[in-house]
Each structure stands twice: as structure tokens, then as C-alpha cells.
Amino acid sequence: MSNEQAHKRVIQGKVVTKAGDKSVTILVERRVTHPKYRKIVKRFKKYIVHDESNAVKVGDMIEAIECRPLSKRKSFSLHKVLSVGVEA
């Protein structure tokens, strides 16, 4: 079982919305080098994460792990809360 879990992607991001029940949206930032200009630029992507216990709030930094598809766009589940943020 631990061998299967080693291949699952782990993402870290900030909770930006908490709209539905047991679901949060996180914003993941990654830094890439521009192919032509060689400048480091930021790229952002939003992921829908399953939060079984409704524990996180907007502004929290969380870590999510890949799981089986739970809905059309939700295929990550909450792994742990890294830091608690201030809700805006």
C-alpha cells in the first residue's frame, strides 16, 4: 500500500474559496523558466480538493494528495493543514 501512495502527486496551495460542502478550491503556484527569455515566471492553477471534515478555512495553506476521481473536476483530497490563515 505504501508503494501505491509513493506515486501519487502531492500539491501545496492556499485555500481561495470554500463554496460547497466538503469541497475547497486551492491556488497552486509554480515557478518556471521562460523558454525564450530565460526569466523565472510564476504560473498558477486552481484545484478542487475534497475536505471530508470541513476543517479548512479560506486563507489556510494545505497539502493535498491525489486520489481517485470524486467528481468531474475533483481528484485530490486533503492530506494536512500546513498553516492556518486569516479569513478575509
Curated annotation (Swiss-Prot):
One of its GO terms (cellular component) is cytosolic small ribosomal subunit. InterPro entries: NA-bd_OB-fold, Ribosomal_uS17, Ribosomal_uS17_bact/chlr, Ribosomal_uS17_CS. Keywords: Ribonucleoprotein, Ribosomal protein, RNA-binding, rRNA-binding. One of its GO terms (molecular function) is structural constituent of ribosome. Coiled coil: none annotated. One of its GO terms (biological process) is translation. It comes from the Bacteria. Belongs to the universal ribosomal protein uS17 family. Part of the 30S ribosomal subunit. One of the primary rRNA binding proteins, it binds specifically to the 5'-end of 16S ribosomal RNA. This is Small ribosomal subunit protein uS17. It comes from Wolinella succinogenes (strain ATCC 29543 / DSM 1740 / CCUG 13145 / JCM 31913 / LMG 7466 / NCTC 11488 / FDC 602W) (Vibrio succinogenes). The lineage of its organism: Bacteria, Pseudomonadati, Campylobacterota, Epsilonproteobacteria, Campylobacterales.
